[in-house]
């Protein structure tokens, strides 16, 4: 499977932001027009975009619909969306609006039947977001930590047709200290579902670390991309061998 780089567009109050460790009060604003950012990443050569409705993740419903719709109107590359999507109506609404892949996070823990139903209704279009703190899954915009282990949650959906798992190490997110390759790789080896790494990329070497690990199928790029620590062309070149 082709290794994919996913520029992240995290939305808070209609703005493009980056958080540290998921803390809403520790947000850096990177622009008031997310659609412009989306075009920028598409023009840089990225084949996918990763969009998160941060307000929605806390509220349990879409809160940045206008910005998301603007992004969809601005680009032709596929977009995956997470944050606040907790029922089938929301899944249907976003897929009909043009989202290529819907990410279910809190719902995967609290209403796993939704994941199964959505996978049947929209084959190949549903991903599971596993956000872990010390190996245990966090929910509700990371405000709560469950007693469910990340590997255990992945196993629940092994044969349900999930298109991908986005695995985020919360402690690394936005910190630029490098992704948790070891835990991500362990998860990827424990499931047949493609696993995408998220959280902690700070420079090109971190991308190469994930790429060279094998088994992991992609990585999400956030603060390092926005701060200019990662050059898009160099990153795309580095992962072009498979």
From Swiss-Prot:
Top class in the EC scheme: isomerase
A molecular function GO annotation: 1-(5-phosphoribosyl)-5-[(5-phosphoribosylamino)methylideneamino]imidazole-4-carboxamide isomerase activity
Gene3D superfamilies according to UniProt: Aldolase class I
Keywords: Amino-acid biosynthesis, Cytoplasm, Histidine biosynthesis, Isomerase
Transmembrane segments: none
Family: Belongs to the HisA/HisF family.
Protein name: 1-(5-phosphoribosyl)-5-[(5-phosphoribosylamino)methylideneamino] imidazole-4-carboxamide isomerase
Annotated organism of origin: Granulibacter bethesdensis (strain ATCC BAA-1260 / CGDNIH1)
Lineage: Bacteria, Pseudomonadati, Pseudomonadota, Alphaproteobacteria, Acetobacterales
